[in-house]
Design a protein with these regions (language model features):
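Sec-dependent N-terminal signal peptides
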Residues: 3-15
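Non-cytosolic coordination micro-motifs
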Residues: 20-64, 92-196
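Short, flexible segments with low predicted structural confidence
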Residues: 12, 89-91
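Compositionally biased P/S/T/G-rich terminal and signal peptide-adjacent segments
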Residues: 66-89
Length: 196
């Protein structure tokens, strides 16, 4: 049976979490790594919401889905699939909660609550708390945009991360919390090939 981690529900419950060792056991809005996106979105929606200009290398296609009716906990659910995969198998999945500039502290509070639950659920995984760093985006010329980041590594190289992004007005992006699940293969590609 899948362990359903709907992160924001866990924050408000006193559930005892089972230790997990497979990223496919976790869901964001009922969606998991390894699922076909066609179970949740039409092909037309996937194509319409694809951001084909996001990566330099086109091996994977990112899809940004904002404010769908079935989203209960997140404002957006984003995913990546191999560009030529007609089944649209999800290899990276994110839940996003948006915040106004004046509400960034709410993002940090929510992040701490989620991390507390994840630390229990993933006590068997290697955990790395990066803390707060300057965002590397070319739009961040004044070095005012930051991100706060913690991630959990599975033994097979898959990863879950939690990040709060605090963007400056000059950057032009909206502050948000991001919970991301990704396979090792996708993570390696993202690190070494996506922007070449």
């Amino acid at each position: 049976m899948r362990i359903f981690i709907i992160f924001l529900i866990l924050i408000f419950s006193n559930q005892s979490l089972t230790k997990a060792d497979d990223i496919r056991d976790f869901e964001i809005e009922g969606i998991s790594i390894g699922d076909s996106a066609l179970k949740f979105f039409t092909q037309e929606q996937i194509i319409k919401n694809s951001r084909n200009d996001h990566y330099t290398n086109s091996k994977y296609t990112p899809v940004q889905n904002d404010f769908f009716d079935f989203f209960k906990k997140y404002d957006a659910v984003d995913f990546n699939f191999k560009t030529n995969d007609s089944k649209f198998i999800i290899v990276s999945l994110s839940g996003v909660i948006l915040y106004d500039d004046k509400d960034i502290e709410k993002c940090y509070v929510k992040m701490k609550e989620i991390i507390s639950d994840l630390d229990i659920a993933f006590s068997n995984l290697e955990q790395t708390d990066i803390g707060t760093s300057v965002h590397p985006s070319p739009k961040n010329k004044l070095k005012k945009s930051t991100y706060t980041y913690k991630y959990y590594d599975f033994s097979n190289g898959d990863m879950i991360s939690v990040t709060c992004y605090d963007y400056s007005k000059e950057h032009g992006s909206q502050d948000h919390l991001n919970i991301n699940l990704q396979t090792k293969e996708f993570g390696n590609w993202l690190t070494y090939e996506a922007y070449e």
